[in-house]
From Swiss-Prot:
This is COP9 signalosome complex subunit 8. InterPro entries: COP9_CSN8, CSN8_PSD8_EIF3K, PCI_dom. Component of the COP9 signalosome complex (CSN), a complex involved in various cellular and developmental processes. The CSN complex is an essential regulator of the ubiquitin (Ubl) conjugation pathway by mediating the deneddylation of the cullin subunits of E3 ligase complexes, leading to modify the Ubl ligase activity. Component of the CSN complex. The holocomplex is comprised of 8 subunits csn1-8. In the complex, it probably interacts directly with csn5 and csn8. Pfam families: CSN8_PSD8_EIF3K (PF10075). Keywords: Cytoplasm, Nucleus, Signalosome. Residues 10-177 form the PCI domain. It is found in: Cytoplasm; Nucleus. Its main location: cytoplasm. GO terms for cellular component: COP9 signalosome; cytoplasm. GO terms for biological process: COP9 signalosome assembly; protein deneddylation. Belongs to the CSN8 family. It comes from the Eukaryota.
Length: 196
């Protein structure tokens, strides 16, 4: 594994701690090569933590010559752009690009998180959705979509091949901050606008 300093955090899937580590390195480290080696991890950690805005800001801070010469960073930026476009099909396609074995835990977790967030948005935004539309939003086959959604208590109407979502009640022990509320509302509105 290339990221020896954070290997334990990666194996425990503690992506918040990985993000904190990368932020500290960017601020405190004098070793520019170390910082450059972590840019991909840093960008993906922002995305895993659902912080697209800071991922975009980090992209702007990365030196242009390094961005242009590093194919892995270019591929990660493709993921950032696809998430920004709020088109799940494009996002799943960009997540299937092989960035390298060292990034596999990040890509796997990001895909799972993206799929879960999309599922929650569908659950709360739709009263009915076709299996094919839901399948493209979740990035899985229609058969797997039916299995997955019915396991979450959705109803499947075989005659019309539609699904009836069950709204998800978020259980939060703390109140969201203003930024979290704005981000959540923005995601919801963008998702609804994209689907019309």
């Amino acid at each position: 594994m290339a990221f020896t300093e954070i290997a334990n955090l990666i194996s425990s899937k503690n992506f918040k701690a990985i993000l904190d580590y990368c932020q500290r390195q960017e601020i405190e480290s004098k070793n520019i090569d170390l910082i450059k080696s972590y840019y991909g991890v840093y960008l993906l950690s922002y995305l895993i933590n659902n912080d697209l805005i800071n991922a975009k800001h980090l992209w702007k801070r990365i030196p242009n010559d390094f961005k242009q010469s590093n194919q892995q960073l270019k591929n990660i930026y493709t993921i950032i752009k696809s998430i920004s476009q709020t088109n799940p099909t494009i996002t799943y396609t960009s997540l299937s690009i092989n960035i390298g074995d060292d990034y596999t835990p990040f890509i796997t977790t990001l895909k799972e998180n993206f799929q879960q967030r999309t599922f929650e948005l569908i659950s709360n935004a739709y009263s009915s959705i076709t299996v094919n539309d839901c399948s493209s939003y979740l990035g899985i086959s229609p058969e797997d979509t039916i299995k997955f959604t019915t396991s979450k208590c959705w109803e499947h109407d075989k005659a019309s091949n539609t699904l009836k979502p069950v709204p998800i009640q978020k259980q939060s022990s703390e109140l969201p901050t203003g930024n979290q509320q704005i981000r959540s509302l923005t995601s919801y509105v963008l998702f609804l606008e994209k689907s019309t």
